[in-house]
Structure formats: structure tokens, C-alpha cells
Amino acid sequence: MPAPRAQEAVTVSVFAQRFSATRRGARLARRLATHRLDLWDLPYGSPASDTVTLVVAELAANAVLHGRVPGRDFEVRLTYDRTAGLVRVEVSDTHPGHPELSDAAVRPSADADGGRGLLVVEAVADRWGVAGRTGPGKTVWAECAVRVPDGPRPVRA
């Protein structure tokens, strides 16, 4: 009988969830993303968690406010590559309109209630963009470099 081989460490983790295209859905997306990051050893209140959570909050809010199609949900997908020290955030909706990358360069007036979501994402993410998806709509994505925790991952019960 061959000797047992050691299991390779999991270096990529994925979280994906669909949410109702409502403000409540956007809040829930942000909260669940923060919880998932904590489970991935990017703890609450850490710079990595705060940055990724902010990106999720802005992209989810945009999906609800600008990408909402009645009766359709939006999806959030987080991919954490521990080896690369990178979290990729993807928010997909079914609205056919695509934000222009140049939209982030248009500054809203100081007293405007909104219009800063992509500016915030551009400021805190290392890269971001828009991609098509299977079916109607688009995926707005952002990548955030994160500090990889030192030492072995703690075992959670």
C-alpha cells in the first residue's frame, strides 16, 4: 500500500451569495462579507477587512441603486488567494448598462448625496473594472492586496 500523501494546504477560498436588490440586501452583503473575511483570518477592524468591506459596500450599493432590475437579485463573490495576498470582490447584477471607467473621474458636487461609489473603489482598491457575464448584466470587480497573516492558520471549531 502506498504511503499516505500530505494534503495540500488550501490557498484560495471563495464566498458567493445572492442578495435581494434592496438597501437591506446591500447591508447584508457587507455584513456577511465582513464575517467571511474574519473567518479567513482577516479580522474585524483590520486594515484588510476595512478596505475589502468598504469595496463590497460601495459595489453592492451601486448594484442596488444603479443596476437594479425589478425581480432580479445581485450576487457578491469574494475570492481570497492567501499565497498572492489578494482579495477579489465581484458584484454582478442583471442591468444591461455598464459604468464607464471614466465615470470615476467625474467628481460630484460637494453637496451631492451620492456619486462617489466608484471614486471610493478607485481610491482604495489596487485595480478595478467591469466585465460581461453569462446572461444579462455585468460584473464590477475590484482587487485589494492584503497583508497575509503570519504563521499557521488557527483551527476553528
Explain the meaning of each model-derived region.
Residues 1-16, 20, 64-157:
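Conserved beta-strand-loop-beta-strand hairpin that lines the nucleotide-binding pocket
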Residues 18-23, 45:
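Short, N-terminal intrinsically disordered low-complexity segments that are rich in Pro/Gly
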Residues 35-57, 110:
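Conserved short strand/loop->alpha-helix "switch" segment adjacent to the catalytic nucleotide/phosphoryl-transfer site
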Residues 61:
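Short alpha-helix lining the ATP-binding pocket of the histidine-kinase-like ATPase
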